Regions:
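A contiguous loop/helix-start segment that scaffolds small-molecule binding in enzyme catalytic cores
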Residues: 3, 8-133
Length: 133
């Protein structure tokens, strides 16, 4: 991708009035926050404004937490896959070829993350690394 764009997927009145021609440009990554409830409309708008239905897309639910889940598909099937998986907010939707790198770059696997370790002398916890690092 040559650029990245962040956009909100939910406006106060419930509309998603975005600059779709700008968002649907090739060779860019689009990240949409607060858009899970309108995901079918969002995917349809990308396709209507020129992105191929086969464009990689994914949703990250509860990113970087122990409850993180990732659903990867294409624009044509993402909304249904997300419904089938029961994905809920908070989540980010990512659209663009960068999503195709997910299998290679899936560095975050919640079950592999270290658990918090209490430090009795400090009254805090170490989440990554070891006490004394």
């Amino acid at each position: 991708a040559q650029s990245v764009v962040f956009a909100t997927g939910f406006l106060k009145d419930g509309r998603i009035d975005l600059d779709w021609p700008m968002l649907a440009r090739p060779r860019q990554t689009v990240v949409i926050y607060m858009g899970i409830s309108r995901l079918a409309d969002i995917c349809a708008q990308f396709i209507a404004h020129g992105l191929p239905p086969s464009t990689p897309a994914g949703v990250i639910e509860r990113g970087t937490t122990h409850a993180q889940r990732v659903v990867v598909a294409d624009l044509a099937t993402l909304a249904q896959r997300v419904r089938d998986e029961g994905v809920r907010p908070p989540s980010l939707t990512v659209v663009g070829s960068v999503v195709g790198l997910y299998p290679k770059l899936a560095w975050f696997e919640p079950e592999a993350q270290p658990k918090a370790s209490p430090l009795p002398h400090a009254g805090c916890a170490v989440v990554h690394g070891k006490a004394g690092d």
